[in-house]
């Protein structure tokens, strides 16, 4: 049986062999022919083992070096014999080696040589036991061991000439049989996926900048043709300098002309009997003839070809290493021409009637010195008081205004609680005894005597459900129940709700109203006094804004603190500082696993109470055991977890097979399957449904993910009917807090999604990585909570030893903008670095500074790190700062409802996408977007259609709409809840008169909601500087110039459009500018998944910052001062009017932010209405000369 240990043993042997490689230059490895020229048995065996040897060699080298073609690394040299053909294969990677092959035909000889090379590669460890390829990362390691690292980023040689071969001939030579340069550049070959992912692909202007820096020796000119016949000694010297001249000539011509053959451009004519005279006619780069002699035809031709190579080198068409230049360098003139076109500003064309309207408006409402300039806009003085001190304290338990109980009320309520407690009946006695119960006195005494206590309890000890009840019992039975108001945080919504329901059930009907929960979009708070409130960490953070000292709260219990999510670490900073403001408050940290002593030290050496848990026996199976059970004797191809965490992969078929095997042969009971993410959950669910077919009714397949609304997730706790097996497919959301009682089998993929932030590229990457050993323990424990169980780990035992003990805290690996904004809301007097340095694990100072700079860049913080007027508004809106900014601007620009939909859909995808139907979803999005060029407006139309069918109250119509548009009803319900929540936030931020206005078409805040270009422009203004400029032409890492391809340039560098955005496949873009919300890093490249084309005038008029103008009195250019992505040109009058219009819009925004929007004077509202009408009309106009054409294969 093939096991991981045997695989590693083989790999070690491979590495030992490759460490003992012979010197760089080896003698040819010969595959000897059989008598008569037939293929020998040994050769047939080789070809049987390597049936496609040439493709295999290309694939190995291509993957290792990250190139799509390996022509330069594999050179076949042919020699004609009397009865057989001989091929010498020159291999240039990983070492310079020659391999020979023979055959009756040239192709047979090539295949034999290639097969021999494959055998050599396998012996070096470059192929797996079954001749399979390795991943690129491993090849890089192998190459380093060879002392021949993979090619680095391509740069022009210092001697490469800064010109094009077209300049060699003033007549612009077009060789016979080709269409010349223009034809070759117009024909773009189809790009494969690997090339599309190349990190090194750059745009034309960047390449030209590099070329100017690195290139010093221009191409020498060659006017007209030439005829060269030299003495034989010169030809021999040339042949010594160029030992494979024909191959070099062919490569040069093929690269320069983008052709697959050089036959038409290099022609030999050989005459003579004893002495052969070879004439080489070279039609590129201009007609040239070379003559040489030799005893054999091949010798004469090689000498002539060597003379040609020498000539090309003198012209600068071959580099100093006698290798061809790149395609881009041969076509530098065209590159420069295209680069010059790209650098030109785009012409502004504003119709004369609109210009007159702008002049009239500015004449009536001049932008004078009374307007606050953009520089002053960053100051936070004299703003509308919208912060946490602007209103009465809020009761953290009920959410109502807080008023302390009088002494009489407290006594009365305490007595009432005591009576209710005594009337509970036998329910408490019926509750199962849990491991935490015998430790009740120790726990309660510690909490009473110490402000902070850490409770470390194993899985199943009952700390989550029982300790809040123990606290309540102690207070109630001592006659002070009214003083007991406990807030218990949970890391996830489903945990908060399910635990609250469990505790409510255990307390019984008489005290049920004293237990409640509050999560996003769903709330059922308890009555005040003797209250247990279960909520998410984010909810408690919001409560701290309106009650900074948590007055009215007796205890805060932070459960699952070991998970170290970013909100929990942030909460601990606040709670640590809160001890000085509210010394009576008791803090309890509860952890299942983790470094609990670290929490103790953080809170000054507070006590740690360890509670042993109880688990039923759990039998564990690892991958090698599982494969044996399934009758698989080797690793499935898609389930080879590589050593690099970046390349963890999961075979969904293996997961499905295992679940079916457990169902067929395992013990009765539920199956809980831990999967990395939503795509994997949907993939396994679809496979199970297909496999079960007509028997699906005997199974309850339940996905559990944060994408699913609470009402749909509650089904996992329900007992299935007799004869029905429950199969739960979950992320790590099911690892802690919640208990599904009938789970007997746990399938652990060993993987989860983890967000990581790249400081260099400033993008996040949601990676699939190995879990920690603590996660494995937690997952295993789900099978032994209520009965004996089984755990199936889809990784080898040896992998467990390599897993890290605990997860890296989220605060150390995620973007910090949201955290910094929260810090400014809670403690505005502290700098971000100062505040976050108080975390259990302080984040990188550079990461904090980057977050501060971004918030300053989007106008949320001023230079002193105080909240600006805009920041004060954003503080009320619970979403990403950039999305919150877009919402605020949408209220001001009166297009609010579509922006609420967009922001909600960026929070929760409305489409029912999976690994199998991505292409179909992309087609639906393209249809929904119409001709708007916007993924975001596709969201708006999808939700609008759903709201329309809901009004019909026709179930069939609703189901048809969902099916036709591949929409997911639970996500749409969640989006509806988000829109409602954001509406409340906007009302709290004084941006609308009442929450219902936000979705009312006739409300003033939605006056321009139908203006698509304005909606996209406002979204762009919120997301700025997330702006893309589309540029024509690119140069690949291999130096291939592709004039009909496009690159996507941002302020930070080049990015790629993901296939999921409709603009990726668009054959024509109406605008060169796109906006986007989020970029993610994958496989070394940065991708954008959502995008919208935006009008260039929207970019000019609606972005923050200054503009720069160059005006000669007749024509003027205007550009963004902080970016080179936008340069527009027009007549001086047009540019001047647009600049003043931009200032008028800035004044409107500033006025709106400095007072309650609905309370602005009527005259000001009318002025703003006229300005917005003018803006909408301007953006309705054509983009003029901003069209960009793309080839279909881009």
From Swiss-Prot:
Stored PROSITE patterns: DEAH_ATP_HELICASE, HELICASE_ATP_BIND_1, HELICASE_CTER
Main localization, broad class: cytoplasm
Tree of life domain: Eukaryota
Subcellular location: Cytoplasm; Mitochondrion; Mitochondrion matrix, Mitochondrion nucleoid
GO BP field: central nervous system development; mitochondrial large ribosomal subunit assembly
Phosphoserine PTM sites in chain numbering: 6, 226, 380
Motif (DEAH box): 559-562
Keyword Nuclease part of the UniProt annotation: no
Any one GO molecular function term: RNA binding
Domain DRBM: 53-121
EC number of this enzyme: 3.6.4.13
Domain (Helicase ATP-binding) ranges: 444-612
Keyword Mitochondrion: yes
Binding site for ATP: 457-464
Alphabetical keyword list: ATP-binding, Cytoplasm, Helicase, Hydrolase, Mitochondrion, Mitochondrion nucleoid, Nucleotide-binding, Phosphoprotein, Ribosome biogenesis, RNA-binding
CDD domains assigned to the protein according to its UniProt record, in alphabetical order: DEXHc_DHX30, SF2_C_RHA
Subunit comment: Identified in a complex with TFAM and SSBP1. Interacts (via N-terminus) with ZC3HAV1 (via N-terminal domain) in an RNA-independent manner. Found in a complex with GRSF1, DDX28, FASTKD2 and FASTKD5.
Record's protein name: ATP-dependent RNA helicase DHX30
Lineage start: Eukaryota, Metazoa, Chordata, Craniata, Vertebrata
């Amino acid at each position: 049986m093939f096991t991981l240990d045997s695989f590693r043993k083989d790999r070690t042997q491979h590495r030992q062999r490759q460490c003992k490689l012979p010197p760089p230059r080896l003698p040819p490895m010969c595959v000897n022919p059989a008598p008569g020229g037939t293929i020998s048995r040994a050769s047939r065996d080789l070809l049987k083992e390597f049936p496609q040897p040439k493709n295999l060699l290309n694939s190995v080298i291509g993957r290792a070096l990250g190139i799509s073609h390996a022509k330069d690394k594999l050179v076949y040299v042919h020699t004609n014999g009397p009865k057989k053909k001989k091929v010498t294969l020159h291999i240039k990677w990983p070492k310079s080696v020659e391999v020979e092959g023979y055959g009756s035909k040239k192709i047979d000889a090539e295949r034999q040589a290639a097969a021999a090379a494959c055998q050599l590669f396998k012996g070096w460890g470059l192929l797996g036991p079954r001749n399979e390829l390795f991943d690129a990362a491993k090849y890089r390691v192998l190459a380093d061991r060879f002392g021949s690292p993979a090619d680095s980023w391509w740069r022009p040689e210092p001697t490469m000439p800064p010109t094009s071969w077209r300049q060699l001939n003033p007549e612009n030579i077009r060789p016979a049989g080709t269409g010349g340069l223009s034809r070759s550049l117009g024909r773009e070959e189809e790009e494969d996926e690997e090339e599309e992912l190349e990190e090194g692909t750059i745009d034309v202007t960047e390449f030209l900048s590099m070329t100017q820096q690195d290139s010093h020796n221009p191409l020498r000119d060659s006017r007209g043709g030439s005829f060269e016949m030299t003495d034989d000694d010169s030809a021999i010297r040339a042949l010594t300098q160029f030992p494979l001249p024909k191959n070099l000539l062919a490569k040069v011509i093929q690269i320069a002309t983008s052709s697959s053959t050089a036959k038409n451009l290099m022609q030999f004519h050989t005459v003579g009997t004893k002495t052969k005279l070879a004439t080489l006619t070279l039609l590129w780069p201009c007609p040239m003839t070379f003559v040489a002699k030799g005893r054999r035809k091949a010798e004469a031709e090689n000498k002539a070809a060597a003379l040609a190579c020498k000539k090309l080198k003198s012209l600068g068409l071959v580099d100093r290493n006698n290798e061809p230049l790149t395609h881009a360098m041969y076509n530098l003139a065209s590159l420069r021409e295209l680069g010059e076109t790209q650098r030109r500003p785009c012409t502004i064309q504003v119709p004369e009637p609109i210009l007159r309207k702008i002049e009239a408006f500015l004449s009536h409402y001049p932008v004078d010195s009374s307007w606050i300039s953009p520089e002053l806009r960053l100051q936070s003085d004299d703003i509308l008081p919208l912060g946490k001190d602007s209103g009465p304290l809020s009761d953290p338990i009920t959410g109502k205004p807080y008023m302390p109980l009088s002494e009489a009320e407290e006594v009365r309520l305490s007595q009432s609680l005591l009576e209710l407690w005594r009337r509970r009946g036998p329910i408490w006695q019926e509750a199962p005894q849990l491991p935490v119960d015998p430790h009740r006195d120790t726990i309660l005494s510690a909490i009473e005597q110490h402000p902070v206590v850490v409770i470390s309890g194993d899985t199943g000890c009952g700390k989550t459900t029982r300790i809040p009840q123990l606290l309540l019992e102690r207070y109630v039975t001592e006659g002070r129940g009214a003083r007991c108001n406990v807030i218990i945080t949970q890391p996830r919504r489903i945990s908060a709700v399910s635990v609250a329901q469990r505790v409510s059930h255990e307390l019984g009907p008489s005290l049920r109203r004293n237990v409640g929960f509050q999560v996003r979009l769903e709330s059922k708070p308890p009555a005040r006094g003797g209250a247990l409130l279960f909520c998410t960490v984010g909810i408690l953070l919001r409560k701290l804004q309106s009650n900074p000292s948590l007055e009215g709260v007796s205890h805060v219990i932070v459960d699952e603190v070991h998970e170290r999510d970013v909100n929990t670490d942030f909460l601990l900073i606040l709670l640590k500082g809160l001890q000085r403001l509210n010394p009576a408050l008791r803090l309890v940290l509860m952890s299942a696993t983790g470094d609990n002593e670290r929490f103790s030290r953080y809170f000054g050496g507070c006590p740690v109470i360890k509670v042993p848990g109880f688990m039923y026996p759990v039998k564990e199976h690892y991958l090698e055991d599982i494969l044996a059970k399934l009758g698989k004797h080797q690793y499935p191809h898609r389930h080879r977890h590589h050593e690099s965490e970046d390349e963890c992969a999961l075979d969904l078929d293996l997961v499905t097979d295992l679940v079916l095997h457990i169902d067929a042969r395992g013990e009765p009971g539920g199956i809980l399957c831990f999967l990395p993410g939503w795509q994997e959950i949907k993939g396994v669910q679809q496979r199970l449904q297909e496999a079960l077919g007509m028997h699906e009714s005997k199974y309850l397949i339940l996905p559990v993910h944060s994408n699913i609304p609470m009402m749909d997730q509650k089904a996992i706790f329900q007992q299935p009917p007799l004869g029905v097996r429950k199969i739960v497919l979950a992320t790590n959301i099911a690892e802690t807090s919640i208990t599904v009682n009938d789970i007997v089998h746990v399938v652990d993929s060993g993987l989860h999604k983890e967000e990581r932030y790249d400081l260099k590229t400033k993008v996040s990457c949601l990676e699939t990585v190995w879990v920690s050993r603590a996660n494995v323990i937690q997952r295993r424990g789900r099978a032994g909570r209520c009965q004996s169980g089984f755990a199936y780990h889809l990784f080898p035992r040896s992998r467990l030893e390599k897993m890290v003990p605990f997860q890296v805290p989220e605060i150390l690996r995620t973007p910090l903008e949201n955290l910094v904004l929260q810090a400014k809301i809670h403690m505005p007097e502290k700098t971000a670095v100062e505040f976050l340095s108080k975390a259990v694990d302080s984040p990188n100072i550079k990461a904090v500074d980057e977050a501060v700079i971004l918030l300053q860049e989007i106008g949320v913080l001023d230079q002193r790190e105080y909240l600006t007027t805009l920041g004060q508004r954003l503080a009320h809106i619970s979403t990403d700062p950039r999305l919150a900014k877009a919402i605020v601007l949408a209220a001001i620009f009166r297009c609010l409802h579509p922006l609420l939909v967009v922001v909600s859909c960026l929070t929760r995808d409305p489409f029912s996408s999976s690994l199998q139907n991505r292409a179909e979803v992309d087609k639906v999005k393209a249809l929904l977007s119409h001709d708007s060029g916007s993924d975001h407006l596709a969201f708006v139309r999808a939700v609008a259609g759903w709201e329309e069918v809901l009004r019909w109250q026709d179930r069939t119509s609703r189901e048809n709409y969902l099916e036709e548009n591949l929409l997911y009803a639970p996500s749409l319900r969640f989006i509806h809840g988000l829109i409602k929540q954001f509406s409340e936030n906007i009302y709290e931020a004084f941006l609308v008169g009442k929450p219902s206005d936000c979705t009312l078409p006739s409300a003033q805040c939605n006056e321009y909601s139908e203006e698509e270009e304005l909606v996209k422009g406002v979204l762009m203004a919120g997301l700025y500087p997330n702006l893309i400029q589309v540029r024509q032409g690119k140069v690949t890492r291999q130096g291939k110039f592709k004039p009909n391809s496009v690159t996507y340039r941002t302020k930070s560098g080049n990015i790629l459009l993901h296939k999921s955005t409709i603009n990726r496949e668009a054959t024509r873009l109406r605008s060169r500018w796109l906006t986007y919300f989020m970029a993610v890093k994958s496989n070394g490249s940065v991708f954008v998944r959502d995008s919208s084309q935006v009008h260039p005038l929207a970019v000019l008029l609606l972005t923050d910052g200054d503009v720069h103008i160059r005006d000669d009195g007749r024509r003027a250019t205007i550009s963004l001062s902080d970016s080179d992505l936008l340069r527009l040109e027009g007549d001086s009058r047009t540019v001047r009017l647009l600049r003043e219009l931009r200032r008028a819009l800035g004044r409107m925004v500033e006025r709106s932010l400095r007072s309650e929007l609905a309370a602005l004077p009527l005259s000001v509202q009318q002025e703003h209405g006229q300005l917005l009408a003018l803006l909408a009309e301007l953006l309705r106009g054509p983009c003029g000369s901003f069209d960009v054409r793309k080839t279909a294969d881009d």
